């Protein structure tokens, strides 16, 4: 089976659904952000602070190409879709899943999370604007799932159905 790339904005449920799908399909799950942190030996927050977003995006593109294109669940960082080369790579080498969640629901979920470099609690309007600027890229995915106010079980049932179509 081709690898499954799970995309979506921060807080949409990519990691949670990736782990659940991994168990269900008996496939390894790989988190691009986690792999970047391991390779760079620093937290993403520190990469952003010390090297900037452009350096992080380069690490992200390199990481994407190093991952298996068969029999893996790949959970991606929310901004991986900003580069056309990444979107093209994922579409050509796997099944791309977009997990949508209402940005106001995401903002509420992330309110206490201090590990997200692009999420500023004080500026929800900027957060929503960033979300909307990426939306068309996310929508290039093969499969779209709305996770807003749904349980993991509901999302998984819908996702399995769409993967098997």
Curated annotation (Swiss-Prot):
Enumerate the SUPFAM superfamilies for this protein.
P-loop containing nucleoside triphosphate hydrolases
Mention any Pfam family matching this sequence. SKI
| EC number, UniProt record | 2.7.1.71
Cellular location(s): Cytoplasm
Cellular-component GO terms for this entry:
cytosol
Pathway field: Metabolic intermediate biosynthesis; chorismate biosynthesis; chorismate from D-erythrose 4-phosphate and phosphoenolpyruvate: step 5/7
Keyword line: Amino-acid biosynthesis, Aromatic amino acid biosynthesis, ATP-binding, Cytoplasm, Kinase, Magnesium, Metal-binding, Nucleotide-binding, Transferase
Q: Cite the binding residues for Mg(2+).
A: 15
**Positions of transmembrane segments:** none
Question: Which cofactors, if any, are listed as required?
Answer: Mg(2+)
Spell out the subunit comment: Monomer.
Q: State its role.
A: Catalyzes the specific phosphorylation of the 3-hydroxyl group of shikimic acid using ATP as a cosubstrate.
Name of the protein described by the UniProt record: Shikimate kinase
């Amino acid at each position: 089976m081709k690898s499954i790339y799970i995309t979506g904005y921060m807080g949409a449920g990519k990691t949670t659904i990736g782990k659940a799908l991994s168990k269900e399909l008996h496939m390894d799950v790989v988190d691009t952000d986690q792999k970047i942190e391991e390779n760079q030996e620093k937290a993403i927050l520190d990469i952003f602070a010390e090297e900037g977003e452009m350096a992080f995006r380069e690490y992200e593109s390199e990481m994407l190409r190093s991952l298996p294109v068969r029999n893996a669940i790949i959970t991606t960082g929310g901004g991986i879709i900003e580069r056309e080369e990444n979107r093209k790579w994922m579409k050509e080498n796997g099944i791309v899943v977009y997990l949508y969640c209402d940005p106001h629901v995401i903002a509420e979920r992330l309110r206490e999370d201090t590990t997200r470099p692009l999420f500023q609690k004080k500026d929800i309007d900027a957060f929503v604007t960033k979300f909307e600027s990426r939306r068309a890229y996310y929508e290039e995915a093969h499969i779209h799932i709305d996770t807003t106010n749904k349980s993991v079980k509901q999302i998984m049932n819908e996702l399995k159905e769409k993967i098997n179509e």
